Amino acid sequence: MRKALGISRIYNILVYIFLYAPILVLIIFSFNDSKNRAVWSGFTLHWYVDLLHNDAIINAFIVTLGVSVLAALVATVFGTLAAIGFFSMRRKPRAFFMGVNNIPMTNADIITGVSLMLLFVFFTQILNDLVYFVGMQTGFWLPVDFHLGFITLLLAHITFDTPYVILSVLPCLRQLDKNLSEAAQDLGATPMQAFTKVVLPQLRPGIINGAIIAFTMSVDDFVISYFTAGADVSNLAMEVYSMARRHISPEINAISTILFTIVMILLIVINVRSIRQEQAEAKRLHALQRDASR
């Protein structure tokens, strides 16, 4: 028995080394004073300073931050409302829509990216044809040209972020006492007041977790962004890929370390919140059982 446990521990250690050793090497060599990726030449922050003077990286960071924040906010609103709608449905319709909701998460990113690209190209062509038709008929030409860019990138991120928000909010809805909203309305609250002051606070943990997950997914995305951003817009993941194709620069180690740190901080926040939520739920159930036994 002890031998089996020892082998299991060794196996787990080897798996973790295999998973995290490359990331650890990347982080260490992001502080290497030399461009040589095999020899340590001393500690430096030179490559991080160079990032601040790299206009392409700065622009990609601004695009990434803007898209991630906006997509997370919109997806959180849409996902929360959709989760409430799904929860209020009967069993069969809810199962159907939940299956549809899970498709973007189980589907290959390249298929989702190509599909969204074709959809956006189709609609941008229709809009450009409409602008041309209006200009020909009225003589008034709108100074617009619809094409793949920031808006299509944002719409794509909202599309794949929303299902994660829905799955984060639904567990909170299942734990919600259905009588709370009715009790609030019996005490004089309007349906909107009952929702905002009674129901919404109960859903807050799931909403916050969903927003953080959505933000993390947007920051980390490459494949879908690559197909939907167009030629004039680039996020950090796309910029790192472009830099890696030209030449392997230590700046790639630095920007990858920054991305990894951001994602890890958000994941730690999610895990801490989940643990606290589980502990609070366990305390609540324990209190109910104690009251019931009296």
Give the ranges of each region predicted by the language model.
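C-terminal transmembrane helix and the adjacent membrane-cytosol boundary/short C-terminal tail
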Residues: 2-10, 86, 134, 170-185, ...
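Periplasmic/extracellular loop-to-transmembrane helix junction in inner-membrane transport proteins
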Residues: 4, 35-71, 245-246
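Short membrane-interfacial helix/loop motifs at transmembrane-helix boundaries
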Residues: 21-55, 226-231, 283
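Transmembrane-helix boundary motif in ABC transporter permease subunits
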Residues: 1-5, 70-101, 114, 118-121, ...
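Interhelical loop and adjacent transmembrane-helix boundary motif
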Residues: 2-4, 48-56, 219-276
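Hydrophobic alpha-helical transmembrane segments of multipass integral membrane proteins
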Residues: 58, 62, 66-78, 82, ...
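Transmembrane alpha-helices
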Residues: 11, 16-23, 103, 107, ...
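Membrane-interfacial helix termini and adjacent extracytoplasmic/periplasmic loops
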Residues: 36-41, 45-46, 50, 110-158, ...
